[in-house]
């Protein structure tokens, strides 16, 4: 098949089409701190919920990922992982959210939620965009069969735990409102690294989804976020916090000890600069009118 419609490329082009208006008068040194689910973070910049880093990079990469988050006070999101790996990451010291796959064996979902509760994770999430393979049939991941989540199942998942439940893979007002009505307390706008071609860029979907919700809940964004300017664009358009994924993998590969922490701190500096230059001096003052779409 011809490689067309790559959603990562489309998302990158969309990000680059968003321009930033400066507003210097009455601005001040910005405060980018964030309170999320009762915890305070130095920045709304988070890690993405990556999986199988030891397989994709080198043995110990997942530990380096968790350590990089802990050393910078960054909220750590983790994707598919065994309980021991999750515990090892949590022991590094970062606040942590685990994203759980839509296992056809639903008991496994509940088991993972109970484990997350037992080790003190900040929240748990469900990957709703991972049930199907390339032929539209059930996806198979590491020997596990996946299946689509129903709204009734999502209600049961939300009611079974005291942890906030987040849904990852939302790109429509339909999924957003269905999830919120089921009791979800956070949404991740993401096309999951080109799960489907020609997907709407998350920042294109963000304003409409935010406007459609009657309840104010955290909205997270991932996909092609690379710089503090990218982060700012997402925040200005209504995101609560923003995840970075593949650039952190590259940073770890280049420098396993300090690459990730250095990258995160540099992106924070870029975000502070952009907030100062636009008069958005804290996260509550983010203003979508400073973003202009270059046609």
Predicted regions and their residues:
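A gly/proline- and charged-residue-enriched helix-loop-helix capping module
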Residues: 69-106
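C-terminal helical cap(s) of enzyme catalytic domains, especially alpha/beta-barrels
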Residues: 8, 140, 199-212, 250-275
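An N-cap/entry alpha-helix motif that binds or orients negatively charged groups
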Residues: 1-41, 285-286, 292
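Active-site cofactor/substrate anionic-group-binding motifs, chiefly glycine-
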Residues: 36-81
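Short, charged beta->alpha transition segments
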Residues: 27-38, 77-89, 112
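Charged C-terminal helix
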Residues: 269-295
